[in-house]
Swiss-Prot record:
Main location: cytoplasm
Assigned keywords, A-Z: Cytoplasm
InterPro entries (alphabetical): DUF2129 (IPR016979)
Record-stated family: Belongs to the UPF0298 family.
Name assigned to this protein: UPF0298 protein GK1096
Keyword Cytoplasm tagged: yes
One matching Pfam family: DUF2129
Location of the protein in the cell: Cytoplasm
Record organism: Geobacillus kaustophilus (strain HTA426)
One GO cellular component term noted in the UniProt record for this chain: cytoplasm
Origin superkingdom: Bacteria
Lineage per the UniProt record: Bacteria, Bacillati, Bacillota, Bacilli, Bacillales
NCBIfam families listed in its UniProt record: PRK02886.1
Amino acid sequence: MFPKRQGIIVWLHSLKYGKQLRKFGNIHYISKRLKYAVLYCDMEQVDHVMKKLASLPFVKRVEPSYRPFLKLEFESKGEKEKDSPYPLG
């Protein structure tokens, strides 16, 4: 139903060119102080978009976001681990 998306972090020399990043994907955030932008595009196009972005003169470097590849479901502690031998308080 929804396409798989991946974030791309783009480090810029100047924020003046931030609007030009719109044609490469959806801009999620632009940091004025650190001069970077986070944009999202389809996972199938990530390599192609990263190569295009890296070739632009106002881009310092381009990094992919590894969030889609991380396990985000965490397990709760077992009953044995919950009971601490040292009481608190």
